[in-house]
């Protein structure tokens, strides 16, 4: 305790950072625990990477795509630059490559933790938020792609998310097509910008076979079944066939395993998939602003081991599920034997002990947010509870 007055400035936090208060902090912890339990049920084992790593390791390889979002600081001990993680996926990939290289493949790992980014976005102004996810490392099969999509759907269902849509994409498709058509770097940048804006006229303005083909690819989006049919009718360059084949096969597996899963396809989406190397996906929920998570295929470690996985964002997930139920809090009068309180806690009650005699117990129960009172060896409900 301190006698120093509390300055109003002490309540100010940097932009994009916030305190999570009761009951929301407890609710978040329970939701994260339920998600992790679902991952464990599917054979994924938890790892825990550090919050800060040396910059050289954190931002090497695919990590270069995250450099602009990474806070940096000098380590006073080693005098080397360090980075605060802005994403946990590549940390888990590093663990697989350096700590578990001899573990049997495919390797299934899960994780949960906080990340910090230099800037927020329009849809996610928070700069610190929680990530919960899995990585399946060492599996190139289409079954691996389908497994992580189905796990994301089942984990969200386990915490009560409703109206979930999974939007599939192949962020390597458009770059592959542009290279096959011998488009220049400047033309490819124009294509990417136009596709990001969903500007069909700008794409068509490229002209020639390239413009026509890219417009057809762009138009082949929507519900999965129709999108696969439309994309199959497009005359793609031979080098782009593997991307289309994988997308088609994964949709078949997902449709067979979960026919009621709401699947869509956006074959030209690339934003946010800077280090993905194949089939990827974004997760949305009806009525919720922003994405619940995203995932996809990438190359893990220095040897480029094939991997896929997904990350859920806890702040958005919490907006997509029911709020916390009212707590079962009971007030214990001063002097209540410890054993009685222990028995109530074993029965699922949250006990709040009165620390001094003489209190108005009903008033104290209301003040402490308790809906019940332990009196005379019985549980009494408080009327006009808070």
From Swiss-Prot:
It comes from the Bacteria. InterPro entries: aa-tRNA-synth_II, aa-tRNA-synth_II/BPL/LPL, HisRS-like_core, HisRS/HisZ, HisZ. GO terms for cellular component: cytoplasm. Keywords: Amino-acid biosynthesis, Cytoplasm, Histidine biosynthesis. Pathway: Amino-acid biosynthesis; L-histidine biosynthesis; L-histidine from 5-phospho-alpha-D-ribose 1-diphosphate: step 1/9. Belongs to the class-II aminoacyl-tRNA synthetase family. HisZ subfamily. This is ATP phosphoribosyltransferase regulatory subunit. It comes from Rhodospirillum centenum (strain ATCC 51521 / SW). The gene is hisZ.
